[in-house]
Amino acid sequence: MKIELQNRQQRARAVYRGIASFYCLLCISLVILYAIRHDAYHLSVSLGALAFPIALPLVWKLPFLKRVWSLDCLILGFVFLAYPLGSCVDLFYWLPGYDKVAHTLSGTFVSLLALILYYCLKPGHAIGRRDKALATAFMILASIAVAGLWEIGEYALAGVVGRDLQRVAATGVADSMQDMIVCTLGTIAAIPVSLRLSDGKKGVLSNMVKDTICLHFGEQTETQGV
């Protein structure tokens, strides 16, 4: 099990480096472009995006954390779609439907993080079939809560950046409601990961969750039947 975990993390490390390299190259190019254009808003957003792959490794240096490369791939991959592509390239504005795709994926993304959090909080941290219902309910409710908080954040930030982030002028409350609906759909799409994990079945995402728990809490996280 330990060798298998190490092999998965080595492969994930190579994938992460590829994602991070392309991420940084795009952000640097955008910083130069927006500096030439004197576009202060997009320049600041691009600089902020460039800081993320620098900050992420620093988080793992906290004494109670151990780096999980497969989790890094998930985090940076989602941030890349939402931040450099969505906000810096401005696909949220230029590509119809991109905003809804991002919100759908955010539901899946947050659900997986919530599933990891569930097993981190669970006494003993063991992964077993008895967790199916509670773990799944936890990830669903956590994801929906984050979706609501995100919309509150957009509402608060709109006055600061001077942009109609929720498209209230054009859609009223429809855009915010649709965002939360598609986020919930993305959450539902992640339910099979929780079920497969509880049953001890392997998969890219279920392995990522299991590896994260195992690296932090040890072999007691092996799937246990009841």
Predicted region positions:
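Membrane-interface helix-boundary motifs at transmembrane edges
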Residues: Q9, H38, L58-L71, H125-D131
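Alpha-helical transmembrane segments of multi-pass membrane proteins
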Residues: P53-P57, F78-G86, S111, L115, ...
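N-terminal membrane topogenic signal
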Residues: E4-F22
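Cytoplasmic-side transmembrane-helix entry/capping segments in multi-pass membrane proteins
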Residues: S44-G48, K66-F78, K100-H103
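Interfacial helix-loop-helix junctions of multi-pass membrane proteins
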Residues: V89-D99, I144-I188, P192
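Membrane-interfacial alpha-helical segments at the cytosolic side of multi-pass membrane proteins
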Residues: L105-K122, G159-L165, T184-L197
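Short, highly charged, low-complexity non-transmembrane loops/tails of multi-pass membrane proteins
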Residues: K201-V226
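Membrane-interface helix caps and helix-loop-helix hairpins in membrane proteins
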Residues: L33-Y41, L62-L65, C88-Y98
